[in-house]
């Protein structure tokens, strides 16, 4: 299928970068962007090495580690695992629990005490951004192992220190962090089928395509464009990171990170606008 260039197509990367920076400059906050054309290798980078609180973008590295350990035979993706709501703080080992009303997926809390397949928890962790599922999976795979895998992949600035809602760790400034560059790196590897193997990479992509939160990268894109992505948000912070698939088979990686947002809603709109600029530039090539 051929895609006709948009009337809004931007002719060159220098002009595109200027327009993106102008869009970001309308907002009070700090933004980062990493774009990679997976056909040509072209990259467009803005604040790509600046550290951000990862929010729920840390769940993609956790997903990767789960598939890596499953491939190594530590468990299978279909193994049953206990749904629990009791976790240890990384500060002192004390127990803490999550509140259903603070989670973007409250349904899993009705399953506490039962067992579900590992896959079901991975799926909820990504598409619903379930914090409870995330903490259960982190207990299964180990945060240190996630970091080790990130280093092996070359992502030196992704830090997954802990699960979600560890308030003692938060108070001590022990947070999960990321950069746009490292997110671009891991999604590039996934898109190329190089995380574990093509089958595992494709399985992760199929989960990410089902993402329920679509207010940033996909928001202004045509409906036949598929996006395999993971969002993240806490007050003043909004992220989206993933792979954009055009119906003609072409694809690109796009990472959008933000922090210190005074107006979250306006920041999200700016990111959706920038995603459309990138799309218009890409199809105009």
Regions found by a protein language model. Give the residues of each.
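Residue-level preference for non-acidic, small/hydrophobic
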Residues: 41, 59-66, 125, 150, ...
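Beta-lactamase-like hydrolase cores
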Residues: 7-53
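Conserved catalytic neighborhood of penicillin-recognizing serine enzymes
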Residues: 88-135
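Acidic helix-start/capping segments at beta-turn-to-alpha-helix junctions
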Residues: 77-99, 141-142
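Mid-domain, small-residue-enriched loop/turn segments at the edges of structured enzyme/sensor domains
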Residues: 30, 114, 118, 129-187, ...
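Extracytoplasmic
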Residues: 26-30, 47-49, 53-57, 76-78, ...
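Active-site SXXK
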Residues: 41, 53-86, 254
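Structured C-terminal helix/loop/strand segments within mature extracytoplasmic catalytic/sensor domains
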Residues: 12-23, 140-142, 185-215, 231-285
